[in-house]
């Protein structure tokens, strides 16, 4: 009987290392992987216009624009009258959070935004993205929350234009 029980316990031990290598992902890991997928899909969409509609559908994209008259210290974004593919700001809903990214037209019209020391970019994205120059075009999303008739920028993102 002691031989049978020792065999059984060694079988149990041999199964546990296999489970350790296939442990389920934590909610944080799942969220991080999904966020990485969002960023990858975003980069594909801004580089290839034919992928924009699929991107919009997959990530529940909304076209936003800055509210014309801002009051106080908060920046408000409202629904844009432009189509998603033509809007300057894309809102994406992910993990019950809202993020604002520069739309594909921002990258394709980079020269206009960069003129006169980024005057157009500073004006159009004030309070939404800080504007900098760097080695290449890149964007970090703004964090939004629902508020009133639109969204409030909780944390501005960063928009980098090439030098």
Region locations from a protein language model:
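Heptad-repeat coiled-coil alpha-helices
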Residues: 1-9
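Short intrinsically disordered, low-complexity segments
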Residues: 8-11, 22
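Extended, amphipathic alpha-helical stalk segments that mediate dimerization
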Residues: 96-163
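Long, compositionally biased intrinsically disordered regions
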Residues: 3, 14-17
